[in-house]
Every structure is written in C-alpha cells, then in structure tokens.
Regions:
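Pre-Walker A (Motif I) flank of P-loop NTPase domains
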Residues: 17-23, 149-150
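Pre-Walker A adenine-sensing motif
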Residues: 2-16
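Walker A/P-loop
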Residues: 34
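ATP-dependent small-molecule kinase phosphotransfer cores
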Residues: 3, 52-148
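Post-Walker A helix-loop "phosphate-sensing" segment adjacent to the P-loop in P-loop NTPases
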Residues: 41-48, 63-66
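Hydrophobic anchor at the beta1->P-loop junction of P-loop NTPases
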Residues: 25, 154
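ATP-binding Walker
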Residues: 28-31
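Small-molecule kinase domains that catalyze NTP-dependent phosphoryl transfer to phosphate-bearing small molecules
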Residues: 26, 137-138, 160-168, 175-234
Length: 234
C-alpha cells in the first residue's frame, strides 16, 4: 500500500501498463469514477460509457413518472403532480426531471431515476437480449476509436462481460473506492464486502469486479488528489 496526497493506492499488479489503449474504471456509485475518467479526458482521452445508449433510450420514453423527493426543486416549467398522501414531494416525468437537473444530479437527488436506468438496462435489455447486448454495441465503437488512434476511458464497468471486453481489446481495468480504509482492506485482501448499500445486480457486481482489478485507488482526498493520481498513472 502506498500513499499519494489524499489518495491511498492498493496495488496488486506492479506491471500496470500506462500505455493501455483502453482503460475501464469500476467502483460503487458516487465513488469518483467519472471524476477519475475526466482527468484522462482532459489529457486527450476519449470517454465512452456502456450506459450512454441506455441513457439516450430512456430519454425517449414518455409517460414514465418518477417520484421527486421533498426539497428537490425543479424548473417552474416542469409539469408536476403533487403527492396527495401527505408524505410530501411530487411526481414528474422522467425526461423532464433529467432535463431540469442534469443526469448526474438527477441520479443522486431522485432515486427513481437511477432505479429506472438499472431496471431498463439490466432487467429489461440484458434480461431479454442477453448479457452481451450492451457489450456488442460498445465493442464496435471502441474498435472504431482505436482505429483512429484514440485512447478510450470507460468509467462505468459493471459486469464481467464488460470487464472481459476491455481485457480482450488489450486494456486494463482499475478500481476507485470511496469509503473507510478498513472496508477497502477487507474487500481487497479478505474478499469481505461491506454490508448494506444498493442491492441491485449492477452494484453487487462492483464488489466482484474490484477483486478482479489489479489496482484500486482509495479516493479519500480532494478532486485534485484524484486527478493527480490518474495523471501519474497514465
């Protein structure tokens, strides 16, 4: 274990290749995956995400309402239906909520947004068309980017098929963890996953995938610390 600024690094693979053409990032929600990827985008890498087509698909849905918790404020132009049960909050259509808040804020502030994406992407698409549905689509995009001489970073690796694709294309996958040192050490060295948290399949898989990586960054510092660690690595 080494320490760099506010970022603890658990390195099980000293041979991590800084010149990989494709880098995947795995971690739980809000662990800093997108921030880590942005550090490379700022250096000229191309960002892709397995969930991008899913998000585009979800934005085309109409008539899908999500519960907006009390205290979350939407633009006055967004049509809302007030909760008449006395619990506070309101309901609005998914695409209006995402337009008003932006995708990342919507996922954090309105839990139904994340749940809808998980259900549509995993339970519906993967459940109906198989585990490689999103992988097959992404592989074509990655190969095209690589043929153009681009380096690709993918901050949303959630399934073993996605991990395997990156390895097959000559890439590496690293982990990003936000939490206490003890829980990370338990996971990395003793295969003990923390209790509680999101129980959806896509989140549960993150624990297994973190164990498959050879390199886990403990993101317990500032954004600048995380940027610095990514730039040092790649």
């Amino acid at each position: 274990m080494s320490l760099s600024g506010g970022v603890t690094v658990f390195d099980r693979d000293p041979g991590l290749n800084p010149d990989v053409p494709v880098l995947g990032i795995v971690g739980l929600k809000r662990s800093g995956k997108d921030t880590a990827a942005q550090a490379l985008v700022d250096q000229g890498w191309t960002r892709m995400a397995f969930a991008d087509p899913l998000k585009e698909m979800a934005m085309k849905l109409r008539g899908v309402w999500v519960e907006v918790p009390e205290g979350v404020h939407l633009d006055a132009a967004v049509p809302v239906m007030r909760d008449s049960s006395g619990h506070g909050g309101s309901f609005a259509q998914y695409h209006y909520v995402v337009d008003a808040l932006g995708m990342e804020a919507a996922k954090d502030l309105v839990p139904d947004v994340r749940r809808l994406l998980q259900t549509l992407g995993t339970d519906c698409v993967r459940g109906t068309f198989g585990g490689t549905a999103w992988v097959d689509l992404m592989e074509r995009k990655i190969r095209q980017a690589l043929s153009n001489g681009e380096s690709v970073v993918i901050p949303d690796v959630r399934f073993h098929e996605e991990f395997d694709l990156i390895a097959r294309l000559g890439g590496d996958v690293i982990g990003v963890w936000r939490g206490d040192d003890t829980s990370l050490a338990d996971l990395v060295f003793h295969n003990i996953a923390p209790k509680g948290g999101d129980e959806h399949e896509s989140e549960r898989n993150a624990y297994e995938l973190l164990l498959r990586t050879g390199f886990v960054i403990h993101n317990n510092g500032s954004i600048g610390d995380l940027y610095g660690e990514m730039c040092d690595l790649f």
